[in-house]
Amino acid sequence: MLKIFNTLTKKKEKFIPINAGKIKIYVCGVTVYDLCHLGHARTFIVFDSVIRYLRHCGYQVSYVRNITDIDDKIIKRAYENNETTQQLTNRMIQEMHLDLDALNILRPNYEPKVTEHIDIIIKFICLLISKKHAYTAPNGDIMFSVETMHNYGVLSNKENPPKIHDNILKIPNIKKNPMDFVLWKKTTYNNKLGEPCWSSPWGLGRPGWHIECSAMNYSIFGNQIDIHGGGSDLIFPHHDNEIAQSVCAHETSYANIWMHSGLLLLNYEKMSKSLNNFFTIRDILKHYDPETIRFFLMSAHYRSQLKYNDNNLKNAQTSLKRLYIALRDTNPTIQPNGGDNEGEYFISKFISKMNDDFNTPEAYSVLFDIAHRLNNLKIKGHSLLAQGMAATLKYLANIIGLLHQNPEIFLKKITLKHNKNRHFEKIQKLIQCREVARKNNQWELADSIRKKLTVMGITLEDGPTGITKWHFK
């Protein structure tokens, strides 16, 4: 029996779908104004493994991951780039798909855009107004009134409410309650910024952040879904506000289970564009195979925080390499079994770990037990048993999107990446030594380093500020 930790109840619960055999799941997507970073990748890989496992269990899963394609950050970035918001978002959506496809992340069944659901959003707001859960602020914005929701903040725990940011408290004339939030933002078309806006009963404007997910979710799935997911940074205010809007509008529980993935940390802080503390997926793909990144991002339990650093990625690559080495010289195309019911034992153990709130670290330990057994069988020359064990290893790893490559091809790829990374590190070290030599007026040494780099195919460009740029010839 599958058990899932529910953020709403703060405990693991037996998973019982609303409709037998079918699951409706909604995961909050990205705001498409820039390339996705590794923190986004962690959330999407977590839920990708969840969806793969649910489908393996025989469920018919309908998966929605939204796209926020209108937002202040989008408007600002489009203006800076001298392009329309639509040009920017269309380009970033394509880039997002390239990155997520590279990580073997399945595409959702539906990928709704905010700009394609404005009418639905307006109707949703009208319903909240008619039920007296929303009001017009003095500046023309439509606000949700949190005082009309008897248990507002239930997800983040209203007995210990999150700290209200100072900038919220500094707007006393706009909100009836400092926690009230925008449903519809009144705007006027700004030719300079090319700011998009839509007609509504309240004048020109655009939707607030929180209403978008409630409305799009409702338009696809109706009043209630099985699972709502996202990063733990969305618990408050986004998911608390989604619950408030949806429960007040339709008087249902909205989502039966709330799942949240832990944050990816860089320098002990959340990996985030707003903190300028991130690496893009594209950055990391230059140095590591996509499957290594996927393996790393599932190496901690999905609810736990995960620390990013180069050593942890290298360790993940070494671990994944061990599994592929075990698969070497096998042909795992036969049915998964290890003989003497070994295969069945490992399969049962793997399933029990995944049934315990999708415990991928424990599931990994089963994969390594299989790899160890497989290596022993190969050493002892039990080729038929080894083939069965290899099939079991590949079968189980495939459930969570791993070991889908040819072992020889994977091992050659990471060797090439490793050599390239070492070459890159050597170049950086030589350039740093040359910069020190120049600062110390050691011109002969600086020139000899330049010549060495030239032989390696590197062209240097010394800038007027003392910064040296380089590129391959």
From Swiss-Prot:
This enzyme's EC code(s): 6.1.1.16
UniProt keyword annotation of Metal-binding present: yes
Compartmental location: Cytoplasm
Motif residue range(s): 'HIGH' region: 30-40
UniProt record, GO biological process: cysteinyl-tRNA aminoacylation
Cellular component, GO, one term: cytosol
Motif ('KMSKS' region): 270-274
Main location: cytoplasm
The record's free-text note on cofactor binding: Binds 1 zinc ion per subunit.
Co-factor requirement: Zn(2+)
Amino-acid positions noted as binding ATP in the UniProt annotation, renumbered to this chain: 273
An MF annotation (GO) of this entry: cysteine-tRNA ligase activity
HAMAP family reported in the protein's UniProt record: Cys_tRNA_synth
Family according to the record: Belongs to the class-I aminoacyl-tRNA synthetase family.
Protein name per its UniProtKB record: Cysteine--tRNA ligase
Species name: Blochmanniella pennsylvanica (strain BPEN)
Gene that specifies this protein: cysS
